[in-house]
Amino acid sequence: MIKVLSMMKRKEDLSLDQFRHWLTQEHVKFARQIPGLLRFVVNIPETDSPDNPFDAVNELYFDDEAAMQNAFSSEAGKASGADALAHISARSRLITVEHRLID
């Protein structure tokens, strides 16, 4: 299983509450349309702090790298990416394989 971590910084004209609403209520509609996306988890800080390097860390799960590539290159994947770029000022991605050590 592949897990993509997407670390995002919101655009400066969005409050953390506005960003949270967009991500959990609006952007998730795009995620639901992405083929092969098995799980989508959003992690948002409880409080706004200038010390936070990111305003959200999203987890996207796929069966394998081919499924991930297919998802991101699909029309739904491109639409999701465009929606994200309209609301964020920066994004970093890390493609990982999860190793659960304690459950």
Kindly give the residue locations of the regions a language model identified.
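Macromolecular interaction modules
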Residues: 1-103
